[in-house]
Amino acid sequence: MSEFSQTVPELVAWARKNDFSISLPVDRLSFLLAVATLNGERLDGEMSEGELVDAFRHVSDAFEQTSETIGVRANNAINDMVRQRLLNRFTSEQAEGNAIYRLTPLGIGITDYYIRQREFSTLRLSMQLSIVAGELKRAADAAEEGGDEFHWHRNVYAPLKYSVAEIFDSIDLTQRLMDEQQQQVKDDIAQLLNKDWRAAISSCELLLSETSGTLRELQDTLEAAGDKLQANLLRIQDATMPHDDLHFVDRLVFDLQSKLDRIISWGQQSIDLWIGYDRHVHKFIRTAIDMDKNRVFAQRLRQSVQTYFDEPWALTYANADRLLDMRDEEMALRDEEVTGELPEDLEYEEFNEIREQLAAIIEEQLAVYKTRQVPLDLGLVVREYLSQYPRARHFDVARIVIDQAVRLGVAQADFTGLPAKWQPINDYGAKVQAHVIDKY
Protein backbone atom coordinates (compact mmCIF):
# COMPACT_ATOMS: atom_id res chain seq x y z
CA MET A 1 0.00 0.00 0.00
CA SER A 2 1.65 3.18 -1.18
CA GLU A 3 2.27 5.99 1.30
CA PHE A 4 3.93 9.32 0.51
CA SER A 5 5.72 11.15 3.29
CA GLN A 6 6.58 14.12 1.04
CA THR A 7 4.18 16.80 -0.03
CA VAL A 8 3.29 17.45 -3.65
CA PRO A 9 5.63 20.50 -4.00
CA GLU A 10 8.50 18.47 -2.50
CA LEU A 11 7.95 15.61 -4.94
CA VAL A 12 7.77 18.01 -7.90
CA ALA A 13 10.98 19.73 -6.85
CA TRP A 14 12.70 16.36 -6.36
CA ALA A 15 11.67 15.11 -9.83
CA ARG A 16 12.79 18.38 -11.42
CA LYS A 17 16.12 18.36 -9.62
CA ASN A 18 16.93 14.79 -10.72
CA ASP A 19 15.69 15.41 -14.28
CA PHE A 20 13.40 12.36 -14.31
CA SER A 21 11.85 11.56 -17.69
CA ILE A 22 10.68 8.51 -19.62
CA SER A 23 10.44 8.31 -23.40
CA LEU A 24 9.79 4.88 -24.90
CA PRO A 25 8.82 4.77 -28.58
CA VAL A 26 7.56 1.44 -29.81
CA ASP A 27 11.01 0.26 -30.95
CA ARG A 28 12.65 1.17 -27.63
CA LEU A 29 9.83 -0.45 -25.67
CA SER A 30 10.22 -3.59 -27.79
CA PHE A 31 13.95 -3.56 -27.03
CA LEU A 32 13.22 -3.28 -23.29
CA LEU A 33 10.76 -6.19 -23.47
CA ALA A 34 13.33 -8.27 -25.36
CA VAL A 35 15.95 -7.53 -22.70
CA ALA A 36 13.52 -8.49 -19.92
CA THR A 37 12.61 -11.74 -21.67
CA LEU A 38 16.24 -12.76 -22.21
CA ASN A 39 17.15 -11.63 -18.69
CA GLY A 40 14.45 -13.88 -17.24
CA GLU A 41 16.12 -16.90 -18.84
CA ARG A 42 19.42 -16.25 -17.01
CA LEU A 43 20.09 -17.47 -13.49
CA ASP A 44 22.30 -14.54 -12.47
CA GLY A 45 20.02 -11.83 -13.90
CA GLU A 46 23.00 -10.11 -15.55
CA MET A 47 23.61 -9.32 -19.20
CA SER A 48 26.71 -8.24 -21.07
CA GLU A 49 26.82 -5.45 -23.63
CA GLY A 50 27.20 -7.99 -26.43
CA GLU A 51 23.99 -9.74 -25.37
CA LEU A 52 22.16 -6.41 -25.35
CA VAL A 53 23.41 -5.69 -28.87
CA ASP A 54 22.16 -9.11 -30.01
CA ALA A 55 18.74 -8.36 -28.53
CA PHE A 56 18.72 -4.98 -30.27
CA ARG A 57 19.59 -6.69 -33.56
CA HIS A 58 16.48 -8.91 -33.27
CA VAL A 59 14.31 -5.85 -32.66
CA SER A 60 15.93 -3.95 -35.54
CA ASP A 61 15.28 -6.84 -37.92
CA ALA A 62 11.65 -7.05 -36.80
CA PHE A 63 11.18 -3.33 -37.56
CA GLU A 64 13.01 -3.75 -40.91
CA GLN A 65 15.66 -1.19 -40.00
CA THR A 66 19.05 -0.99 -41.69
CA SER A 67 21.78 -3.24 -40.34
CA GLU A 68 24.68 -1.01 -41.39
CA THR A 69 24.49 1.20 -38.29
CA ILE A 70 23.36 -1.50 -35.87
CA GLY A 71 26.30 -0.97 -33.51
CA VAL A 72 25.86 2.79 -33.20
CA ARG A 73 22.09 2.59 -32.78
CA ALA A 74 22.37 -0.21 -30.21
CA ASN A 75 24.91 1.81 -28.21
CA ASN A 76 22.62 4.87 -28.30
CA ALA A 77 19.64 2.78 -27.17
CA ILE A 78 21.61 1.24 -24.27
CA ASN A 79 22.89 4.64 -23.13
CA ASP A 80 19.36 6.04 -23.32
CA MET A 81 18.05 3.16 -21.17
CA VAL A 82 20.78 3.83 -18.59
CA ARG A 83 20.02 7.58 -18.60
CA GLN A 84 16.31 6.91 -18.01
CA ARG A 85 17.16 4.56 -15.12
CA LEU A 86 15.75 1.50 -16.88
CA LEU A 87 19.15 -0.27 -16.87
CA ASN A 88 22.02 -0.15 -14.39
CA ARG A 89 25.55 -0.31 -15.80
CA PHE A 90 28.41 -1.82 -13.78
CA THR A 91 31.97 -1.41 -15.03
CA SER A 92 35.25 -2.85 -13.77
CA GLU A 93 38.73 -1.37 -14.05
CA GLN A 94 40.15 -4.85 -14.64
CA ALA A 95 37.88 -5.51 -17.64
CA GLU A 96 37.48 -2.11 -19.25
CA GLY A 97 34.83 -2.00 -21.98
CA ASN A 98 33.13 -5.15 -20.72
CA ALA A 99 30.26 -3.72 -18.66
CA ILE A 100 27.52 -5.69 -16.92
CA TYR A 101 23.89 -4.56 -17.07
CA ARG A 102 20.95 -5.25 -14.78
CA LEU A 103 17.33 -4.13 -15.04
CA THR A 104 16.32 -1.46 -12.52
CA PRO A 105 13.09 -1.70 -10.47
CA LEU A 106 11.56 0.80 -12.92
CA GLY A 107 12.51 -1.37 -15.89
CA ILE A 108 11.15 -4.49 -14.18
CA GLY A 109 7.92 -2.69 -13.33
CA ILE A 110 7.34 -1.58 -16.93
CA THR A 111 8.13 -4.98 -18.42
CA ASP A 112 6.02 -6.76 -15.80
CA TYR A 113 3.06 -4.63 -16.81
CA TYR A 114 3.39 -5.62 -20.46
CA ILE A 115 4.45 -9.26 -20.01
CA ARG A 116 3.59 -10.95 -16.71
CA GLN A 117 0.55 -8.97 -15.59
CA ARG A 118 -1.40 -9.30 -18.84
CA GLU A 119 -2.75 -12.77 -18.10
CA PHE A 120 -5.56 -13.29 -15.62
CA SER A 121 -5.25 -16.44 -13.52
CA THR A 122 -7.88 -17.60 -11.04
CA LEU A 123 -5.31 -19.94 -9.48
CA ARG A 124 -2.91 -17.06 -8.93
CA LEU A 125 -5.64 -14.96 -7.33
CA SER A 126 -6.69 -17.86 -5.10
CA MET A 127 -3.09 -18.36 -3.95
CA GLN A 128 -2.75 -14.64 -3.20
CA LEU A 129 -5.96 -14.63 -1.17
CA SER A 130 -4.86 -17.78 0.66
CA ILE A 131 -1.57 -16.13 1.62
CA VAL A 132 -3.40 -12.98 2.73
CA ALA A 133 -5.84 -15.01 4.83
CA GLY A 134 -2.97 -16.81 6.57
CA GLU A 135 -1.07 -13.59 7.26
CA LEU A 136 -4.18 -11.85 8.59
CA LYS A 137 -5.05 -14.77 10.87
CA ARG A 138 -1.54 -14.84 12.36
CA ALA A 139 -1.59 -11.06 12.79
CA ALA A 140 -5.03 -11.21 14.46
CA ASP A 141 -3.87 -13.96 16.84
CA ALA A 142 -0.78 -11.92 17.72
CA ALA A 143 -2.90 -8.80 18.26
CA GLU A 144 -5.21 -10.62 20.66
CA GLU A 145 -2.24 -12.03 22.58
CA GLY A 146 -0.85 -8.53 23.09
CA GLY A 147 2.68 -7.54 24.01
CA ASP A 148 5.19 -4.72 23.97
CA GLU A 149 5.79 -2.26 21.13
CA PHE A 150 8.33 -4.57 19.47
CA HIS A 151 5.73 -7.37 19.46
CA TRP A 152 3.16 -5.15 17.72
CA HIS A 153 5.67 -3.92 15.13
CA ARG A 154 7.10 -7.34 14.32
CA ASN A 155 4.06 -9.63 14.50
CA VAL A 156 1.17 -7.32 13.55
CA TYR A 157 2.27 -4.18 11.73
CA ALA A 158 5.02 -5.74 9.58
CA PRO A 159 2.87 -8.56 8.06
CA LEU A 160 0.04 -6.10 7.36
CA LYS A 161 2.34 -3.50 5.84
CA TYR A 162 4.72 -5.61 3.76
CA SER A 163 2.63 -8.67 2.86
CA VAL A 164 -1.11 -8.04 3.03
CA ALA A 165 -0.99 -4.49 1.67
CA GLU A 166 1.25 -5.45 -1.27
CA ILE A 167 -1.01 -8.36 -2.25
CA PHE A 168 -4.04 -6.05 -2.07
CA ASP A 169 -2.21 -3.69 -4.43
CA SER A 170 -1.49 -6.59 -6.77
CA ILE A 171 -5.19 -7.56 -6.83
CA ASP A 172 -6.12 -3.93 -7.46
CA LEU A 173 -3.68 -3.87 -10.38
CA THR A 174 -5.28 -7.03 -11.76
CA GLN A 175 -8.67 -5.31 -11.71
CA ARG A 176 -7.28 -2.28 -13.52
CA LEU A 177 -5.78 -4.55 -16.17
CA MET A 178 -9.19 -6.17 -16.54
CA ASP A 179 -10.62 -2.69 -17.13
CA GLU A 180 -8.18 -2.21 -20.00
CA GLN A 181 -9.03 -5.62 -21.43
CA GLN A 182 -12.74 -4.78 -21.30
CA GLN A 183 -12.11 -1.61 -23.30
CA GLN A 184 -10.04 -3.58 -25.82
CA VAL A 185 -12.85 -6.14 -26.18
CA LYS A 186 -15.33 -3.30 -26.77
CA ASP A 187 -13.09 -1.89 -29.51
CA ASP A 188 -12.78 -5.34 -31.12
CA ILE A 189 -16.56 -5.84 -31.06
CA ALA A 190 -17.13 -2.39 -32.58
CA GLN A 191 -14.71 -3.16 -35.42
CA LEU A 192 -16.36 -6.53 -36.06
CA LEU A 193 -19.86 -5.03 -36.19
CA ASN A 194 -18.75 -2.20 -38.46
CA LYS A 195 -17.26 -4.62 -40.99
CA ASP A 196 -19.96 -7.27 -41.31
CA TRP A 197 -22.25 -7.69 -38.32
CA ARG A 198 -23.87 -10.85 -39.68
CA ALA A 199 -20.57 -12.72 -39.95
CA ALA A 200 -19.34 -11.20 -36.67
CA ILE A 201 -22.21 -12.35 -34.46
CA SER A 202 -20.51 -15.57 -33.37
CA SER A 203 -17.21 -13.78 -32.68
CA CYS A 204 -19.01 -11.10 -30.65
CA GLU A 205 -20.82 -13.76 -28.63
CA LEU A 206 -17.50 -15.44 -27.85
CA LEU A 207 -15.84 -12.19 -26.74
CA LEU A 208 -18.84 -11.20 -24.61
CA SER A 209 -19.15 -14.59 -22.90
CA GLU A 210 -15.40 -14.93 -22.24
CA THR A 211 -15.18 -11.48 -20.65
CA SER A 212 -18.34 -12.08 -18.59
CA GLY A 213 -16.95 -15.40 -17.36
CA THR A 214 -13.60 -13.89 -16.40
CA LEU A 215 -15.22 -11.03 -14.49
CA ARG A 216 -17.57 -13.40 -12.67
CA GLU A 217 -14.69 -15.74 -11.81
CA LEU A 218 -12.67 -12.87 -10.36
CA GLN A 219 -15.61 -11.56 -8.32
CA ASP A 220 -16.65 -14.98 -7.00
CA THR A 221 -13.11 -15.64 -5.81
CA LEU A 222 -12.95 -12.25 -4.07
CA GLU A 223 -16.36 -12.55 -2.41
CA ALA A 224 -15.62 -16.08 -1.17
CA ALA A 225 -12.59 -14.83 0.78
CA GLY A 226 -13.77 -11.29 1.54
CA ASP A 227 -15.80 -12.08 4.68
CA LYS A 228 -12.95 -13.98 6.35
CA LEU A 229 -10.48 -11.21 5.55
CA GLN A 230 -12.78 -8.55 6.97
CA ALA A 231 -13.39 -10.64 10.11
CA ASN A 232 -9.66 -10.88 10.86
CA LEU A 233 -9.19 -7.16 10.23
CA LEU A 234 -11.99 -6.46 12.73
CA ARG A 235 -10.26 -8.72 15.28
CA ILE A 236 -7.09 -6.65 14.96
CA GLN A 237 -9.06 -3.42 15.19
CA ASP A 238 -10.82 -4.57 18.36
CA ALA A 239 -7.49 -5.56 19.91
CA THR A 240 -6.00 -2.10 19.28
CA MET A 241 -8.90 -0.13 20.76
CA PRO A 242 -7.72 -0.24 24.44
CA HIS A 243 -4.22 0.99 23.43
CA ASP A 244 -3.78 4.67 22.63
CA ASP A 245 -0.21 4.21 21.39
CA LEU A 246 -1.18 1.84 18.54
CA HIS A 247 -2.72 4.44 16.27
CA PHE A 248 -0.29 3.47 13.47
CA VAL A 249 -1.71 -0.09 13.48
CA ASP A 250 -5.29 1.17 13.63
CA ARG A 251 -4.66 3.51 10.69
CA LEU A 252 -3.15 0.71 8.63
CA VAL A 253 -6.09 -1.62 9.39
CA PHE A 254 -8.53 1.11 8.33
CA ASP A 255 -6.64 1.60 5.04
CA LEU A 256 -6.70 -2.16 4.39
CA GLN A 257 -10.44 -2.33 5.08
CA SER A 258 -11.06 0.53 2.67
CA LYS A 259 -8.89 -1.11 0.02
CA LEU A 260 -10.69 -4.46 0.38
CA ASP A 261 -14.13 -2.81 0.25
CA ARG A 262 -13.10 -0.86 -2.83
CA ILE A 263 -11.79 -3.97 -4.59
CA ILE A 264 -14.96 -6.00 -3.97
CA SER A 265 -17.26 -3.05 -4.73
CA TRP A 266 -15.55 -2.25 -8.02
CA GLY A 267 -15.61 -5.93 -9.01
CA GLN A 268 -19.40 -6.02 -8.70
CA GLN A 269 -19.82 -2.63 -10.37
CA SER A 270 -17.63 -3.76 -13.26
CA ILE A 271 -19.87 -6.81 -13.76
CA ASP A 272 -23.00 -4.63 -13.73
CA LEU A 273 -21.50 -2.27 -16.30
CA TRP A 274 -20.51 -5.19 -18.52
CA ILE A 275 -24.03 -6.66 -18.31
CA GLY A 276 -25.37 -3.32 -19.52
CA TYR A 277 -22.92 -3.29 -22.41
CA ASP A 278 -23.80 -6.91 -23.25
CA ARG A 279 -27.48 -5.96 -23.49
CA HIS A 280 -26.62 -2.94 -25.63
CA VAL A 281 -24.76 -5.12 -28.14
CA HIS A 282 -27.58 -7.66 -28.31
CA LYS A 283 -30.13 -4.87 -28.74
CA PHE A 284 -28.08 -3.47 -31.62
CA ILE A 285 -27.90 -6.89 -33.28
CA ARG A 286 -31.65 -7.48 -32.85
CA THR A 287 -32.41 -4.05 -34.31
CA ALA A 288 -30.08 -4.69 -37.22
CA ILE A 289 -31.79 -8.02 -37.90
CA ASP A 290 -35.24 -6.38 -37.86
CA MET A 291 -34.10 -3.65 -40.24
CA ASP A 292 -32.22 -6.04 -42.48
CA LYS A 293 -34.89 -8.70 -43.05
CA ASN A 294 -35.74 -7.31 -46.51
CA ARG A 295 -32.10 -6.74 -47.40
CA VAL A 296 -31.12 -10.38 -46.98
CA PHE A 297 -32.91 -11.53 -50.13
CA ALA A 298 -31.51 -8.63 -52.16
CA GLN A 299 -27.97 -9.40 -51.03
CA ARG A 300 -28.28 -13.10 -51.84
CA LEU A 301 -29.80 -12.31 -55.23
CA ARG A 302 -27.02 -9.83 -56.04
CA GLN A 303 -24.37 -12.36 -55.05
CA SER A 304 -26.03 -15.08 -57.11
CA VAL A 305 -26.11 -12.85 -60.19
CA GLN A 306 -22.45 -11.88 -59.76
CA THR A 307 -21.32 -15.51 -59.49
CA TYR A 308 -23.69 -16.88 -62.15
CA PHE A 309 -20.97 -17.86 -64.64
CA ASP A 310 -18.98 -19.69 -61.93
CA GLU A 311 -22.04 -21.27 -60.31
CA PRO A 312 -24.97 -21.30 -62.79
CA TRP A 313 -28.47 -21.47 -61.37
CA ALA A 314 -32.04 -21.68 -62.64
CA LEU A 315 -34.99 -19.53 -61.56
CA THR A 316 -38.36 -21.23 -61.15
CA TYR A 317 -41.41 -19.01 -60.85
CA ALA A 318 -45.13 -19.66 -60.61
CA ASN A 319 -46.52 -16.41 -62.00
CA ALA A 320 -44.91 -15.09 -65.16
CA ASP A 321 -46.93 -11.83 -65.17
CA ARG A 322 -45.79 -11.02 -61.67
CA LEU A 323 -42.15 -11.34 -62.71
CA LEU A 324 -42.62 -8.49 -65.22
CA ASP A 325 -43.98 -6.13 -62.54
CA MET A 326 -41.00 -5.94 -60.19
CA ARG A 327 -40.34 -2.17 -60.33
CA ASP A 328 -41.87 -0.12 -57.54
CA GLU A 329 -43.06 2.60 -59.92
CA GLU A 330 -44.96 0.16 -62.11
CA MET A 331 -46.50 -1.61 -59.12
CA ALA A 332 -47.76 1.65 -57.65
CA LEU A 333 -49.17 2.75 -61.02
CA ARG A 334 -50.94 -0.55 -61.54
CA ASP A 335 -52.49 -0.51 -58.06
CA GLU A 336 -53.87 2.98 -58.53
CA GLU A 337 -55.41 2.11 -61.90
CA VAL A 338 -57.12 -1.03 -60.67
CA THR A 339 -58.13 -0.28 -57.08
CA GLY A 340 -57.48 3.40 -56.59
CA GLU A 341 -56.26 4.65 -53.21
CA LEU A 342 -56.92 2.08 -50.50
CA PRO A 343 -58.82 3.48 -47.46
CA GLU A 344 -56.84 3.41 -44.21
CA ASP A 345 -59.55 1.48 -42.33
CA LEU A 346 -59.61 -1.21 -45.00
CA GLU A 347 -55.82 -1.38 -45.20
CA TYR A 348 -55.40 -2.27 -41.52
CA GLU A 349 -58.63 -4.15 -40.98
CA GLU A 350 -57.20 -7.61 -41.45
CA PHE A 351 -54.11 -6.97 -39.32
CA ASN A 352 -56.12 -5.41 -36.48
CA GLU A 353 -58.50 -8.35 -36.53
CA ILE A 354 -55.61 -10.78 -36.18
CA ARG A 355 -54.08 -8.71 -33.39
CA GLU A 356 -57.33 -8.55 -31.41
CA GLN A 357 -57.89 -12.28 -31.74
CA LEU A 358 -54.33 -13.11 -30.73
CA ALA A 359 -54.41 -10.71 -27.79
CA ALA A 360 -57.57 -12.34 -26.46
CA ILE A 361 -56.19 -15.86 -26.94
CA ILE A 362 -52.82 -15.02 -25.37
CA GLU A 363 -54.39 -13.25 -22.42
CA GLU A 364 -56.56 -16.27 -21.74
CA GLN A 365 -53.96 -18.99 -22.29
CA LEU A 366 -50.92 -17.31 -20.75
CA ALA A 367 -52.85 -16.39 -17.62
CA VAL A 368 -52.39 -20.02 -16.60
CA TYR A 369 -48.60 -19.55 -16.43
CA LYS A 370 -48.93 -16.52 -14.17
CA THR A 371 -51.57 -18.12 -11.94
CA ARG A 372 -49.63 -21.34 -11.43
CA GLN A 373 -46.22 -19.57 -11.46
CA VAL A 374 -45.07 -21.93 -14.21
CA PRO A 375 -42.00 -20.88 -16.26
CA LEU A 376 -42.91 -19.68 -19.76
CA ASP A 377 -40.62 -20.81 -22.58
CA LEU A 378 -41.12 -18.10 -25.18
CA GLY A 379 -39.58 -20.18 -27.97
CA LEU A 380 -42.08 -23.04 -27.55
CA VAL A 381 -45.04 -20.67 -27.22
CA VAL A 382 -44.15 -18.71 -30.37
CA ARG A 383 -43.58 -21.91 -32.33
CA GLU A 384 -47.00 -23.21 -31.25
CA TYR A 385 -48.74 -20.05 -32.44
CA LEU A 386 -46.86 -19.85 -35.74
CA SER A 387 -47.89 -23.39 -36.62
CA GLN A 388 -51.49 -22.11 -36.80
CA TYR A 389 -50.79 -19.40 -39.41
CA PRO A 390 -49.36 -19.32 -42.95
CA ARG A 391 -45.72 -18.40 -43.46
CA ALA A 392 -46.54 -14.93 -44.82
CA ARG A 393 -47.95 -13.90 -41.43
CA HIS A 394 -45.23 -15.41 -39.24
CA PHE A 395 -43.27 -12.18 -38.71
CA ASP A 396 -46.28 -10.14 -37.57
CA VAL A 397 -47.69 -12.96 -35.45
CA ALA A 398 -44.34 -13.58 -33.74
CA ARG A 399 -43.99 -9.89 -32.92
CA ILE A 400 -47.47 -9.80 -31.37
CA VAL A 401 -46.89 -12.95 -29.32
CA ILE A 402 -43.55 -11.73 -27.97
CA ASP A 403 -44.97 -8.28 -27.19
CA GLN A 404 -47.79 -9.82 -25.18
CA ALA A 405 -45.63 -12.42 -23.43
CA VAL A 406 -42.99 -10.02 -22.11
CA ARG A 407 -45.71 -8.02 -20.37
CA LEU A 408 -46.30 -10.93 -18.01
CA GLY A 409 -42.90 -10.82 -16.36
CA VAL A 410 -39.14 -11.07 -16.77
CA ALA A 411 -36.51 -13.79 -16.92
CA GLN A 412 -34.12 -13.86 -13.98
CA ALA A 413 -31.45 -15.27 -16.30
CA ASP A 414 -31.35 -11.87 -18.06
CA PHE A 415 -29.54 -10.44 -15.02
CA THR A 416 -26.64 -12.90 -15.32
CA GLY A 417 -25.36 -11.26 -18.49
CA LEU A 418 -25.21 -14.59 -20.32
CA PRO A 419 -26.92 -14.77 -23.73
CA ALA A 420 -29.86 -17.11 -24.24
CA LYS A 421 -29.76 -19.93 -26.76
CA TRP A 422 -31.32 -19.47 -30.18
CA GLN A 423 -34.47 -21.59 -30.63
CA PRO A 424 -36.19 -22.33 -33.96
CA ILE A 425 -39.78 -21.07 -34.10
CA ASN A 426 -40.82 -22.33 -37.53
CA ASP A 427 -39.66 -24.67 -40.27
CA TYR A 428 -38.23 -21.87 -42.42
CA GLY A 429 -35.15 -20.92 -40.40
CA ALA A 430 -36.64 -18.25 -38.12
CA LYS A 431 -35.20 -18.27 -34.58
CA VAL A 432 -35.76 -16.40 -31.32
CA GLN A 433 -33.31 -15.70 -28.51
CA ALA A 434 -34.99 -15.36 -25.12
CA HIS A 435 -34.59 -16.70 -21.60
CA VAL A 436 -37.46 -18.54 -19.90
CA ILE A 437 -39.80 -16.08 -18.15
CA ASP A 438 -39.90 -17.19 -14.52
CA LYS A 439 -40.72 -14.04 -12.54
CA TYR A 440 -44.19 -12.57 -13.00
From Swiss-Prot:
Location of the region described as Leucine-zipper in the Swiss-Prot/TrEMBL record: 208-236
Disulfide-linked positions: none
Single GO molecular function: calcium ion binding
Main location: cytoplasm
GO cellular component terms, A-Z: cytoplasm; nucleoid
Keyword terms, alphabetized: Calcium, Cell cycle, Cell division, Chromosome partition, Cytoplasm, DNA condensation
The keyword Calcium is assigned to this record: yes
GO BP: cell division; chromosome condensation; chromosome segregation; DNA replication
Pfam families from the UniProt entry: KicB, MukF_C, MukF_M
Subcellular localization: Cytoplasm, Nucleoid
Gene3D superfamilies, per the entry: Chromosome partition protein MukF, middle domain, MukF, C-terminal domain, Winged helix-like DNA-binding domain superfamily/Winged helix DNA-binding domain
Function: Involved in chromosome condensation, segregation and cell cycle progression. May participate in facilitating chromosome segregation by condensation DNA from both sides of a centrally located replisome during cell division. Not required for mini-F plasmid partitioning. Probably acts via its interaction with MukB and MukE. Overexpression results in anucleate cells. It has a calcium binding activity.
Family recorded in the similarity comment: Belongs to the MukF family.
Subunit annotation: Interacts, and probably forms a ternary complex, with MukE and MukB via its C-terminal region. The complex formation is stimulated by calcium or magnesium. It is required for an interaction between MukE and MukB.
Protein name, entry field: Chromosome partition protein MukF
Organism annotation: Shigella boydii serotype 18 (strain CDC 3083-94 / BS512)
Underlying gene: mukF
